[in-house]
Amino acid sequence: PGTNEIFGIHHMDFSLLKECRIFHLGYPPLLPRLIADDGHELEMLLSSVKGEGVITSLDLSLPDSEGNAGLANWPRILKRVLPSVDIFLPSIEEIVFMFRKSEYENWNGNILPNVTGNYLRKLASEILELGVAVTGFKLGVMGFYLQTTKDPQRLQVLESVIDIERWCDVNLWHPAFSVQVQGTTGAGDSAYGGFLTELLHGSSPHEALRIACAVGACNVEQSDAVSGILHRSETQARVEAGWATSSLKLPE
């Protein structure tokens, strides 16, 4: 078996956390040991990291509907682990598959034409109620949606990097930037990375969301996963120069 197959909490060197500001974990659906027993090890891992005072961030991948990950009880897993997650920004396809499986199936996996601003707000509110501080959904050609907790106390864990007052009770959508798409591999990861980078630089929610969209857009201009990504200052300059956004609008 590969490393994904066997990776578990015992592989973690928790002494490294003293050097971390954000602990980011990707792809529980590809880490079968972590999601076994309704996410027992995943919960242990994230709660242990959070117990060290480190900001926790979680990203997903779309499970294989016919594999073990696709058959997992994702509502139960997420309800178990999300209280230990500070930042949670999955794609809309991933979260609908896991949290609203019947809708995913009714829509045949074609999620974007069926979502509205109201749908996203309700779904994000459900996630925030599970204990997450900052959540949102990567929307591909429709951009990025962001929503944060109304509880300033929940944001205290982020106070070393953000202005809590500016980040409390936020509800934002940013359209995608206009690009010639060459490939989408790594687009969501790039956008998430751009968001976390802006968070570490103390940016506002709007700026973090804007740059997240920009980094994702730069990524898709190349066919591979990384070569389109620019330095932060170059990305900012491109946005400030008036980079046009998509004409697609999010229905209310």
At which residue positions do the language-model features occur?
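Hydrophobic residues in alpha-helical segments
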Residues: 99, 199-200, 219-220, 239
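Short arginine-rich
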Residues: 218-227
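Glycine-centered loop/turn positions within well-structured domains
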Residues: 142, 193, 218
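Ribokinase/PfkB-type carbohydrate-kinase core domain
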Residues: 1-177, 226, 230-252
